Amino acid sequence: MTEPVFVKGEKALYGPKAEPALIDVPPMKFFMIEGVGNPNEEGGAYQQAVGLLYALSYTVKMSVKGGYTPNGYFDYSVAPLEGLWRMADGSAGVDYDRKSQFAWTSMIRQPDFVTDEVFQWAIAEVRRKKKLDAVAARLATYAEGLCVQCLHIGPYSA
């Protein structure tokens, strides 16, 4: 049986070219956490959220090694971290001089076999094994739709 295409086989979505391109991003499942604050703050809300997202994602990926096999499971690579950024006060654009006012949604894409049941199992495992509070995490489908994809090279503040 061939492994379903997941992230690595989707170059149009995860392999931007040097020239901007119009792409249509289909609805996809993600583990998501929302918050506000400077992403560079040591031990801050953003860094904690990223740690929790990876803990949940790797718990699902490694589930078969622990004796739990979700229905439809296939081996895959954990998807890259993605994020949505805006200002907490609703102002247009992003003001890099006010990083403490960044509102963010950090997310890691999940395979289609990740259901609410699998998500709840992963939350329980992360609480039990890693002692992490996963109350802020959620499983949701995000539909980006038609957008422009462009490759940015350089610092985030540029």
Spans of features found by a protein language model:
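A solvent-exposed interaction/effector surface
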Residues: 1-158
